[in-house]
């Protein structure tokens, strides 16, 4: 009797959600491949390293990920402490990505540019739901292709902020003033202090003159 082929799961993003998905996939006998566009796991979280989270450690540690970490000799943080983004990276994301079996399943500097079903296009739909996925991504060496049985998008929204206008549209004049608008959470007390000192906050946006 032939052995069933191991299913491959492509996971976009190596943040806490993507790594948790990979940990659960491994526990279920699946083969996860994590594609992270940044140079290291937790790339987006590192951009808000200065922000303290609104929930303590006990609610931010995935159980499957925790099992992998404990098997690698990890010391869990105090459950009632509220971590910053930097804490989350240093005490959870980095050890999970570098010290557990997940390290062999993560591709960094891998920017996904397109996903489709193998053998299908916009005018062919019958049987589409059973066809494997084809993922195109870029890395430092050029374009690459990956086949997977399923895709999990855990890329998040940090690098894809909403526009300032209503109805999901770019506001009039927004594109022209893009260099003056901060769409995320700048570190106004640290890294970005010089840029924003003495500037004005308007309509929830930090704007430079």
Feature annotation, model-predicted:
Residues 8, 149, 203:
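Conserved acidic residues
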Residues 17, 40, 158:
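Conserved Rossmann-like nucleotide-cofactor binding loop
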Residues 6, 109, 202:
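Phosphate-coordination loops involved in phosphoryl transfer and adenosine-cofactor binding
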Residues 21, 44, 117, 162-164:
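Short glycine-/acidic-enriched loop or helix-start segments at secondary-structure transitions
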Residues 38-91:
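Glycine-rich active-site loop/strand segments that organize a redox cofactor
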Residues 75-160:
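Feature captures the FAD/FMN-dependent oxidoreductase FAD-binding
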Residues 155-209:
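Glycine-rich dinucleotide-binding loop and its adjacent helix/turn
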Residues 7-34, 209:
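N-terminal Rossmann-like FAD-binding beta1-loop-alpha1 element of flavoenzymes
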